[in-house]
Amino acid sequence: MRFIRERRAADPVPRPPRLRRAGALTVALVTLVAGGVLADRDAVDARAASGGSAAVGGHAGHAYALSPEQEAAALELQLAPVRGSEFRADCPSKGRAGDDPIVMWGRPGASHTHEFFGNTTTNAYTDLASLRAGGTTCNPVADKSAYWVPTLYQNGVAQKPQSVRIYYQGLTDRANVKPHPQGLRIVVGNPLATSAGQNPAARWNCVGIPAASGDFPVCPAGSKLETYLDFPTCWDGKNLDSPDHKSHMAFGLGGVGGTCPASHPVPVPRLEFLITYDVRGTGLSLAGIRDGANVTTAPGYTFHGDFFNAWDEAELARRVKNCIVDGYICGNDGQPIQQ
């Protein structure tokens, strides 16, 4: 038997099948570096509970713009050869609700409908303590993180994901990658987008068809719909959240194997959501916000997602070291996959 390990520069580097399907994508998200950050949960909770950050920003907290330099960096990161340096968690849906414990903390029912994965206690009042005490749908059970995305609809009927896989990948400064700190919160994507070009973190395609789109494709019989969502790879090293829920994070520069900007010097694994739905054809839409109102008719290019880290710290650190730093593709148990 042998293990799957990262191929070195002299070796051919084929794309893994899951990424080959999305090989037509030519854009990826780079988070704008902005000022004004919050270092602790209590401050964020207090602002949200008093109608501060959550009430003022609402879903405007998801909006962003890309500079030409950042677009170029994103393109380089997306198109560079993908190395075998990752681990994963499979986290079936635990249900849906109109809550968003990052953007609209303490306001149950205020958000458009989200599909929640991972921690079984996630609601509008979720904090790190409740996640630590909760259960999880994830394999491995060491991952008690909360993950969520807008609910998908077909002809007005909510669709439960068939599968949800969360990849943790070593793309930026792999030798120095650090685990995400417990309590880290990240939002990625743009629910206020008016075109696919305004939301390059998200993409859709049909299983088995090597093309990707910012909006819903029409999947033929025999296929099904899937979506990818990419998270940033660099942390500022200080703040577990920020007022816009993104400025404490940034994407690495220089493509795969590149480095973090000085403003965000700590490389972390890139999260990539891979969500599959057993649907095809037309009539697709997302839960979202349009003209200030929650709707179920938002277009595919408004897809976005949230991550609230509650991994067991020792297990996450082990996987980062044994899989990402050491250059292996690992399974759900955090061990190199045998073939």
Report the location of each language-model feature.
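Generic hydrophobic/packing signal
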Residues: 31, 40-42, 102-105, 233
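Secretory targeting and sorting signals
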Residues: 1-45
